[in-house]
Amino acid sequence: TQMYLVIFPEGTRYNPEIPKVIADSQSFAEKEGLAILKHVLTPRVKATHVAIDTMKDYLDAVYDVTVAYEGTVDHKGQRKLAPSMTEFLCKECPRVHIFIDRIELKDIPEEQMYMRRWLHERFEIKDKLLIEFYDAKDSKRRNKFPGKSVHSKLSLKKTLPSLLFLGGLTASMLLTESGRKLYVKTWIYGTLIGCLWVSIKP
């Protein structure tokens, strides 16, 4: 079965508002003799190694994806938290930039020890891309990734069917008393469960 498996080797999000996570990541890299990264966290190799090793007979390549957001640097030049979906839809973040690099499977070391070095080198490349994106002294080079770019806009043709489906589903629920009760319960219990999950998950 054709599929994609997405892995975030850092294990958690890079959040400038939680400096302890960034500091812990950098001290781990220093302790292990690895390059200290500024705009990304130090990757851990285990899950990546297990995934690639298990799927190697079905893979021909791995895609290294780096994402950056415009409008997320404050007046002091410090990175802010990545925008939420609401902030993005309200145009507080004008564009999302995605840099994709295709790596042939044959170019990825099989042994975990060597794959660890390879993975960290990939994150060093990501870090350089993001330093250029966020911190470039030349303003013309800021908010851009190098190389040829393709601009992609969400067309009405792609978004309208989802809007009509979800809008129709919500409207049909709100037309009946039992539907309204279910709608309210979904909001209340969904929010409570979500808050509980966020507070107890490691």
Map each language-model feature to its residues.
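Non-catalytic C-terminal accessory region of glycerolipid acyltransferases
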Residues: T1-P202
